Amino acid sequence: MRYQNMFETLKKHEKMAFIPFVTLGDPNYELSFEIIKTLIISGVSALELGLAFSDPVADGITIQASHLRALKHASMAKNFQLLKKIRDYNHNIPIGLLAYANLIFSYGVDGFYAQAKECGIDSVLIADMPLIEKELVIKSAQKHQIKQIFIASPNASSKDLEQVATHSQGYIYALARSGVTGASRILENDSSAIIKTLKAFSPTPALLGFGISKKEHITNAKGMGADGVICGSALVKIIEENLNNENAMLEKIKGFIGGMIF
């Protein structure tokens, strides 16, 4: 219900969803919590939180580095502790997890989704799991009332997009370009065709991710028919560049979010 409520409220005010991505536990668990509180206070629509992994193949160098920083002290037990703390801090904001398949399968699929539910998580996106393998997780997701999100890539066939649109819950993650994550100067591709195709198959909101780093990118995404954007690398870069100055980091994050939301 949290995603539904969020999108209904945004639609009423003719606003785009702005969802930031950060890696949980980067650069440490204490500061990670302060970063996430700052994001919430700054007015983001929802949270997308990555679970640190040793081989984040879908990510570019900025987010890879955040995984490495978090891995110095990360554990699944600590991840779930922090997630509970975040949910206790704010009961209404939608919280999504972005994880790599190996983390979930080594933990145990049903146990992972059960813990996610316990922590008040709303959705899970598995970065490196193709749609064809959805049956491996979908029963556990449904059992524990977690929305399973799938990725729509620019080179996907119409048939694949139909599957993504049909099976994604909460929202659909539409990639603005192929390749790995990373901030872009310009949005390289016109994603209006892929978004139009997704919307023909399902009313589930489509969010554009990969390369979102400027306000104009959000304006462009809106023009393409997207319901919102996911922004990761540009935000994680602020964390990376201010590791030695916590106050400056949080102020710059606040300023960045303030400049992106409209």
UniProtKB/Swiss-Prot annotation:
Positions annotated as active site in the UniProt record = 48, 59
Q: Which GO terms describe its molecular function?
A: tryptophan synthase activity
Q: What are the EC numbers?
A: 4.2.1.20
Keywords (alphabetical) are:
Amino-acid biosynthesis, Aromatic amino acid biosynthesis, Lyase, Tryptophan biosynthesis
Q: Which Pfam families match?
A: Trp_syntA
Coiled coil (UniProt feature): none
Provide a GO biological process annotation. L-tryptophan biosynthetic process
Q: Which GO terms describe its cellular component?
A: cytosol
Catalysis: reaction(s): (1S,2R)-1-C-(indol-3-yl)glycerol 3-phosphate + L-serine = D-glyceraldehyde 3-phosphate + L-tryptophan + H2O
Query: Enzyme class, one word?
Result: lyase
Q: Which pathway features in its UniProt record?
A: Amino-acid biosynthesis; L-tryptophan biosynthesis; L-tryptophan from chorismate: step 5/5
The record's comment on protein family reads: Belongs to the TrpA family.
Please give the NCBIfam families that the UniProt record associates with this protein.
trpA
Q: Which PANTHER family match?
A: TRYPTOPHAN SYNTHASE ALPHA CHAIN, CHLOROPLASTIC (PTHR43406:SF1), TRYPTOPHAN SYNTHASE, ALPHA CHAIN (PTHR43406)
User: What name goes with this protein?
Assistant: Tryptophan synthase alpha chain
Native species: Helicobacter pylori (strain ATCC 700392 / 26695) (Campylobacter pylori)
Gene expressing this chain: trpA
